[in-house]
A protein has these predicted regions:
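Patatin-like phospholipase
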Residues: 1-25, 33-276
Length: 276
């Protein structure tokens, strides 16, 4: 997962190019779902760049609310990674974080649209793509609580605990469809404006822990399904935007402004295609 700010949406907004549907995978579901719910690119950019991601990625309450014993224990901190044995089996946590703070952020981000049950009833029809962890199949959310669909789509294995909803377990949609061209086609669109960020492989020095290894495995799976999607793009009518994010990686949330600027520059390069 890398930053995905709506580069093409920002430019199409300026050029007054109508957007009839939005489809998003992983961080793209956060961006796409927010845009479909009515947020302007400017407001979305402001929210994403100003939020404290360190707080979002911490399931703990503020330190001021800790009991005295825990505050004292924090003077000699240890790595909090719970491992245990139950019924003779090794038990590990489902993810580094449960994602409670992230879910609250999503709820607030699309406030006013979180009660819309059919995504076709949003200001712009929307689909979020996730992976069904039980059978490995692609899951396309077209209804339900919007923040839940967004959270399910970007439940990066190893980082976030899987999302359980409607009797199913979901993880990041990038595992099966990082560039959901076929989903957009099925919604009946004539022209697709796609943003392919790719996953990018982590350098060796970042593969020394479980999150690094998990991230690399996800990147490998993602890069295997993207070429299939790229073949579905019609160069005569569709527009493909490929920002060069350089060394900006999945965890560089503090570098969101750089990622946005790079994305906007890439979108402007294809402005003639967007205007045709």
């Amino acid at each position: 997962m890398r930053f995905e700010i709506p580069e093409q949406k920002k430019l199409t907004y300026e050029m007054r190019i109508p957007i009839h549907v939005v489809v998003g995978t992983s961080m793209g579901s956060l961006v796409g779902g927010s845009y479909a719910a009515g947020l302007t690119p400017e407001i979305l950019e402001q929210r994403v760049t100003q939020v404290d991601w360190n707080v979002l990625f911490n399931d703990d309450p503020p330190r001021k609310d800790w009991p005295a014993r825990r505050k004292q224990a924090s003077e000699n901190p240890t790595f909090d990674f719970t491992v245990g044995v139950r019924d003779g089996q090794l038990k590990l946590p489902k993810g580094a974080i449960s994602g409670q703070q992230v879910q609250l952020f999503f709820n607030d981000l699309v406030k006013g649209a979180e009660t819309v049950q059919r995504f076709d009833d949003l200001p712009i029809p929307f689909r979020a793509v996730a992976t069904n962890l039980e059978n490995g199949e692609m899951a396309v959310f077209d209804h339900g609580p919007l923040p839940v669909a967004m959270r399910a789509s970007m439940s990066v294995p190893g980082l976030f605990a899987p999302m359980e909803w409607d009797d199913h377990i979901y993880v990041d949609g990038g595992l099966v469809r990082n560039l959901p061209i076929d989903v957009a086609r099925r919604m009946g669109v004539d022209v697709i404006i796609a943003v392919n960020l790719g996953s990018g492989y982590l350098p060796r020095d970042q593969l020394g822990n479980i999150l690094g290894v998990t991230g690399q495995m996800i990147a490998i799976l993602t890069e295997q399904n993207v070429p299939v999607s790229l073949k579905q793009i019609d160069p005569k009518r569709d527009v493909l935007i490929v920002p060069d994010l350089g060394d900006i990686t999945a965890g560089d949330f503090s570098r969101a402004p750089e990622a946005i600027a790079t994305g906007v520059a890439a979108a402007r390069k294809v402005a003639p295609q967007l205007a045709r």
